[in-house]
C-alpha cells in the first residue's frame, strides 16, 4: 500500500481532476466543490466523460461540473424528461460517448442537444432499473435484479439479455469473466458466474462469503474483492489467493472498502471513513 489520500469532512467533496503533477507520484491536483456550488455531501459515484465534464451522482440528484460551475439535474414531477429519481447508483459513458445514469426508478440516457434525458423501457413498456454496468466491445451491459440487459451499438437498442433465477440477486458490480460469462457481485448474496447464453449460474473458484461491498477485474485480469469489513483480496482466475490487505498487515486505512478504480496501473481504494488508498 503506497499512498493514502485523506478525505475532508462531508461539507465538501474532493474530485481528482485529470492533471497529474510530474514532480512526485503522490502529488495530485485537487479541486474542491463545496455546498456553496450546490453539491450535496452524499456523493455516491463520479464519472469524468470524454469532453472533460465531471458527472457526480448523489442521493439527491445528479451534478455536471465543467471546471467552473456545477449544473444540477433532479426529478421534476411536471417534467417528463427529467430524471426518474434523485437517488443515483452509477454513471457510465459507453464507447459512443452516451452518458447513462442509473437511478432508483430506472436508467436514463442523457441527451446533449436538449440537455435532458430519455428512458429505455422493457418489452412491457416499463422502465429498466439497473445498479451496475460493464463495457463490452459491441455495447454496454447493465446489471439489474436477476437480470442482465444489453445496449447494442448496432441498432441502438436496450434489451433483456439474460434472466437467471438467483433469489433476488441484485447485481451491484459486474465484469466479464470470459466471452460468454459474467462475474456478478451482490451486496448480500455474494458472487456468481452467469452464463450469458443459458442463464445458468454457479459460484466462482473462490469464496469470500455472502457480504461483498465491491468487486472489480483489473487490466491484468486479476479479481479484486472486498468482503464487508474484511479488507481487500486479490484472486487469479483459477481461484488462487494472490494477495490480501487489511489494517492488520498493510497501510490500508479501513477494513471496509466501498469502491475500487484503476488508473495508470494503480488501484484506487475508497474506504468507509478512511479516505482513499492507492496501491
Short names for language-model regions:
Residues 1-279:
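Carboxylate-rich, polar loop motifs that coordinate divalent cations or form catalytic acidic clusters
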